Amino acid sequence: MNPNSNSITKSHLFHIVNPSPWPILTSFALLLLVIGGISSMHGYKFNMYILSAGVISVIYCLYSWWRDVVQEGIVEHQHTSPVRKGLKIGMVLFILTETVFFSVFFASFLKSSISPVGILDGVWVVKQGIWPPPTIKTFDPFDIPFINTLILLLSGTTITGAHYALEEKNQKDCVTALAFTIVLGIFFTLMQVYEYYHAEFKFTDGIYASNFYLATGFHGAHVVIGTIFLIVCYFRAKRGDFTTEGNGHLGFEFAAWYWHFVDVVWLFLFTFVYILGS
């Protein structure tokens, strides 16, 4: 980061990013996180240490990277109109890739439900199975899953209220609505953990269980990431970083987009995995 870069007159409106260690360090941190996750699934030695190191490394790298991006926008004023447009396109493309990512889980779950695999004379045979498998005791969709649906729908309302308050230059209401959204996100995560703790099937108990935990688990991870995103926005809003002039609240806008995306994915999960899957 060059603190004097703002004093240099540029002949264009684009931001030439300074050399940064965070992309490559984040890549290694994610690799460590994946290794830790796989080790935990197989019960390898030191798996929790590796997983914890991966989580801490990813959080630190992302914090440092986003801190630099915020500084480039607020301190160095590098986020000109073309730069903001590029950031918006990047966020839209990111959400589209996430849509494809979750579509794979839905496709796998639906394919397995249409053509369930069962064991016949010791051989895995298509269409000989029952869906859900008789060994799986599914969750009541109108118990904890329904409560979580209401929580996320309410959080979508509060984040929209925060955005509206920001547009109206009402900092107090914006901060309050963000706080409510964060609390709802944390409560959703705690309810999900409670559901997992009382589940009567494990990740390794067949195709239904693995599909269920992968789909809901990755969604839960996205809720945690979104909650962290909102916590950052909460402190930035309290500090007065966000303005309505020149679209000076991209960070908040992206957090709201991401949170609404998480809401929509959950509605599909609730419909296909919990209701139709039960």
UniProtKB/Swiss-Prot annotation:
Pfam families named among the record's database cross-references: COX3
Enzyme class name: translocase
Keyword Cell membrane appears in the UniProt entry: yes
UniProt-listed SUPFAM superfamilies: Cytochrome c oxidase subunit III-like (SSF81452)
Nucleotidyltransferase recorded as keyword: no
Keyword annotations of the record: Cell membrane, Membrane, Translocase, Transmembrane, Transmembrane helix
InterPro entries from the UniProt entry: Cyt_c/ubiquinol_Oxase_su3 (IPR024791), Cyt_c_oxase_su3_dom (IPR033945), Cyt_c_oxidase-like_su3 (IPR000298), Cyt_c_oxidase_su3-like_sf (IPR035973), Cyt_c_oxidase_su3_a-hlx (IPR013833)
Gene Ontology molecular-function annotations: cytochrome-c oxidase activity
EC number: 7.1.1.9
Catalytic activity: 4 Fe(II)-[cytochrome c] + O2 + 8 H(+)(in) = 4 Fe(III)-[cytochrome c] + 2 H2O + 4 H(+)(out)
Bilayer disposition of the protein: Multi-pass membrane protein
GO biological process, one term: aerobic electron transport chain
Protein localization: Cell membrane
Disulfide bonds: none
GO cellular component terms attached to this protein's record: plasma membrane
Domain of life, source organism: Bacteria
Transmembrane segments: 21-41, 46-66, 89-109, 174-194, 212-232, 256-276
Protein family membership: Belongs to the cytochrome c oxidase subunit 3 family.
Protein name per the record: Probable cytochrome c oxidase subunit 3
Organism: Rickettsia prowazekii (strain Madrid E)
Gene that produces this protein: ctaE
